[in-house]
């Protein structure tokens, strides 16, 4: 079902006022693309349906990675590419969160702050994985950066999927200890992660006052690890929820009041058991918050490490899968086509069934 309101609608309302928000040219470029997505401004295709024999216009998408309308097909492509990479082992979901003291630096030096987050998270897992007391094997990790909270505030954190074990020096698989109930002690991981992250920032060009470091060392850092998945089948589908997710989906926008220039959207209160609530912001404040999560140009927000890195998988993954007796795992496919404009089989309004569309021309 198509959402009633979209981020593009809100951008359309404030298009003449965007310059007053103090955004960068990179922000404006992304917002401009989102506002034009799947409109006449992007051009499109004229398709003829062999079911209803009507012509249908399919406008092109902007394909910007921050666009709420364009993420569905990218997520499906990513999931399909991961199907052949699963191992027949338990997987854990680990979340590394930055304290709010670094938020202002994330806005001004996003590449450094976010890259350091990836590095520190992987270094933390490596330290525990390499230690025979905890595992004694080379680990792997798929990490996805999210920068938002439910209210669109800045809340940088990494969602990581980690196989429950690693490769010994002899090349044999070693299962995670603790009877598979948890990966490593999260309290210990939090302390190591804090040290690793601060060390990365100190090595960077960022000049952060010592009082900021004192403040972050005086508080507990959040590292959260969920219990293992029921089976590898659920791993990629689960991570697929996070890979191409953006700050807010169009479906969360409950109301757009054009006259008063107000936006109401739904949010979950995780401190209250995920209870749903509604928030109302001015359209300008909504856009300002949305723009907080436009990543720096060229920044890679999904990264693979260790035995899940591209180089390692290409050379050694088939052998490890054979050792672990990994079977081909079928992932449930969505019925939504990868791209509405380019799809061969789609369902159009007033059509009774999924039908073949013939591309009969460009707009």
Regions found by a protein language model. Name each.
Residues 1-363:
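Beta->alpha loop/short-helix hinge microenvironment recognizer with preference
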């Amino acid at each position: 079902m198509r959402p009633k309101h979209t981020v593009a609608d809100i951008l359309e309302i404030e298009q003449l006022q965007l310059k007053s928000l103090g955004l960068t040219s990179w922000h404006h470029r992304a917002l401009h693309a989102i506002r034009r997505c799947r409109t006449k401004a992007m051009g499109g295709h004229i398709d003829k349906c062999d079911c209803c024999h009507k012509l249908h216009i399919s406008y092109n998408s902007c394909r910007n990675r921050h666009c709420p309308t364009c993420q569905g097909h990218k997520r499906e492509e990513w999931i399909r590419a991961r199907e052949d990479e699963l191992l027949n082992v338990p997987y854990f979901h680990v979340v590394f969160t930055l304290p709010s003291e670094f938020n202002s630096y994330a806005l001004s030096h996003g590449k450094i702050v976010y890259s350091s987050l990836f590095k520190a998270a992987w270094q933390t897992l490596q330290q525990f994985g390499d230690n025979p007391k905890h595992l004694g094997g080379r680990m792997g990790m798929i990490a996805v950066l999210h920068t938002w909270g439910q209210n669109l505030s800045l809340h940088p954190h990494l969602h990581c999927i980690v196989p429950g074990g690693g490769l010994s020096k002899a090349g044999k698989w070693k299962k995670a200890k603790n009877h598979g109930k948890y990966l490593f002690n999260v309290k210990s991981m939090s302390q190591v992660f804090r040290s690793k992250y601060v060390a990365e920032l100190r090595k960077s060009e960022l000049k952060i006052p010592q009082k900021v470091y004192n403040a972050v060392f005086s508080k507990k850092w959040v590292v959260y690890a969920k219990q293992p998945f029921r089976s590898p089948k659920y791993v990629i589908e689960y991570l697929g929820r996070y890979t191409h997710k953006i700050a807010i989906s169009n479906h969360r926008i409950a109301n757009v009041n054009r006259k008063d220039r107000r936006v109401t959207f739904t949010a979950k209160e995780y401190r209250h058991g995920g209870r749903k609530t509604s928030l109302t912001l001015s359209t300008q404040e909504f856009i300002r918050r949305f723009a907080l999560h436009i990543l720096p140009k060229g920044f890679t927000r999904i990264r693979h490490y260790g035995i899940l890195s591209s180089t390692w998988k290409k050379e050694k993954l088939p052998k490890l899968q054979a050792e672990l007796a990994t079977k081909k795992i079928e992932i449930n496919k969505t019925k939504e086509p990868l791209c509405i404009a380019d799809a061969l089989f789609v369902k159009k309004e007033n059509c009774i069934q999924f039908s073949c569309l013939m591309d009969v021309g460009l707009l």
